[in-house]
């Protein structure tokens, strides 16, 4: 796919905004240090002559950046070297592009390298203030459809806050007011004074590494290359999800059940020996779990992590593996109450170097896995005036072992799993995923 860039502009807030330095909480600082990629796809309505008109979008964007002014700023460091946001109103990058390709050529919208072409590339360097915190790209396809590619610097917002901004922008483009104004002050997530963690917080401990056991025997029909990774997306229908529920005796949340299934299938596909420790990273939104809950519209990162750990043999059994995996996940999630989350903030405050806790390839690779659910997020609400997206999902998966759970845009009760695994493991994972 060849992308032709037609226009690149910097869109600034349409009115003067506060010029200040915004303090980042510890949760804002332990996230991966890149722009989180996502892509929306839209079909063109038959009567739309101004479909995704850049003028309309840029005008609405400038207005949205007034209440969401940190998004138009840049990263900076305070006198102690701590990363903060310089709310200087320098703006966000807005790109208009076109391609001779058609939306249908993307098939199931797996977050491959081709999908990444729909998001502006950010050049990182030593100067953290050199790049915009938000980059956007409108790409017009020959079929008449359009994509919106979003790259959002993770220090600025998590998924919930990022969608709050995008959906507010789309509301303004439709002539509506912002439904929930953003709450900018992040000091609500300061650690207690003095910090007093009351749990060991294994979520921030090093991930298990592979045992020195002999490597599993490989399928001779599959070419082996441990460095090669593959990215795929798999749909689970409502009927398949109901069948999965019938396989366990206890009642589990949909997330615990599906995550348990993915954890089990991944462990088998990787050929983990029974005594191999494996950790599952479950991203958990703390907004409603904290007491009192954070204000509606809190803008920033509020992602904590539940991390069930098991010996692979406990979760790979044919009869009891799914129940064991789902049970561990549900218990780990139930523990994420106000006391635990406040303890996590205190634990982070006592760490001499938060950069050592930043998640990366070393976190999720074999034998571990991360699974982030977007099923409760309003990922299909960005209607700019020409209808809702037919698909929204990650624009790439940065690490082997990282996966996303996505809701259906059709409201049919299905969901999809987008995942990155070693290529030789992906084939077996797909087979296992559908053996319900």
From Swiss-Prot:
Q: Give the similarity note.
A: Belongs to the plant acyltransferase family.
Describe its function: Hydroxycinnamoyl transferase that catalyzes the transfer of an acyl from p-coumaryol-CoA to various acyl acceptors. Can use feruloyl-CoA and caffeoyl-CoA as acyl donors.
Query: What name does this protein carry?
Result: Hydroxycinnamoyltransferase
- Give the source species: Narcissus pseudonarcissus
Keyword Hydrolase attributed? no
The broad enzyme category this protein falls into is transferase
Active-site positions on this chain = 154, 383
Q: Annotated pathway, please?
A: Phenylpropanoid metabolism
Keywords attached to this entry: Acyltransferase, Alkaloid metabolism, Transferase
**Is this entry keyworded Acyltransferase?**
yes
Q: In which tissues is it expressed?
A: Mostly expressed in stems, and, to a lower extent, in bulbs.
Q: Which GO terms describe its biological process?
A: alkaloid metabolic process
Which Gene3D superfamilies does its entry note? Chloramphenicol acetyltransferase-like domain (3.30.559.10)
Give the molecular function GO annotations: acyltransferase activity, transferring groups other than amino-acyl groups
């Amino acid at each position: 796919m060849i992308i032709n860039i037609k226009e690149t502009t910097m869109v600034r807030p349409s009115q003067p905004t506060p010029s200040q330095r915004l303090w980042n909480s510890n949760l804002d600082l332990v996230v991966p240090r890149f722009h989180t990629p996502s892509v929306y796809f839209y079909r063109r309505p038959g009567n739309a002559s101004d479909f995704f008109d850049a003028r309309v979008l840029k005008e609405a964007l400038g207005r949205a950046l007034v209440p969401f002014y940190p998004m138009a700023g840049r990263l900076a460091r305070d006198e102690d070297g701590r990363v903060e946001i310089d709310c200087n109103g320098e703006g966000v990058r807005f790109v208009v592009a076109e391609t001779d390709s058609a939306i249908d050529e993307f098939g199931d919208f797996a977050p491959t390298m081709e999908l990444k072409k729909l998001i502006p590339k950010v050049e990182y360097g030593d100067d953290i203030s050199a790049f915009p915190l938000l980059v956007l790209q409108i790409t017009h396809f020959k079929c008449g459809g359009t994509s919106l590619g979003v790259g959002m610097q993770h220090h600025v917002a998590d998924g919930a806050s990022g969608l709050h901004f995008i959906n507010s922008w789309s509301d303004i483009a439709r002539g509506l007011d912002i439904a929930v104004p953003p709450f900018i002050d992040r000091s609500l997530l300061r650690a207690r004074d003095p910090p007093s963690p009351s749990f060991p917080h294994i979520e921030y401990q090093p991930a298990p590494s592979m045992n020195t056991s002999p490597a599993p025997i490989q399928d001779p029909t599959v070419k082996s290359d441990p460095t090669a990774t593959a990215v795929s997306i798999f749909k689970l229908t409502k009927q398949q999800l109901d069948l999965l529920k019938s396989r366990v005796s206890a009642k589990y949340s949909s997330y615990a059940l599906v995550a348990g299934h993915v954890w089990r299938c991944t462990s088998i596909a990787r050929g983990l020996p029974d005594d191999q420790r494996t950790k599952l990273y479950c991203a958990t939104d703390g907004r409603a779990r904290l007491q009192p809950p954070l204000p509606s519209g809190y803008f920033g990162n509020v992602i904590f992590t539940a991390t069930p750990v098991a010996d692979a043999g406990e979760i790979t059994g044919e009869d009891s593996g799914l129940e064991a995996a789902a049970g561990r996940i549900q218990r780990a999630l139930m523990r994420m109450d106000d006391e635990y989350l406040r303890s996590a903030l205190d634990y982070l405050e006592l760490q001499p170097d938060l950069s050592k806790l930043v998640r990366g390839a070393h976190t999720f690779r074999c034998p571990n896995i991360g699974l982030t659910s977007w099923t409760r997020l309003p990922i299909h609400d960005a209607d700019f005036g020409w209808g809702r997206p037919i698909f929204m999902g990650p624009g790439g998966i940065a690490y082997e072992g990282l996966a996303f759970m996505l809701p259906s845009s059709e409201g049919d009760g299905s969901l999809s799993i987008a995942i990155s695994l070693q290529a030789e493991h992906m084939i077996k994972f797909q087979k296992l995923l559908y053996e319900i």
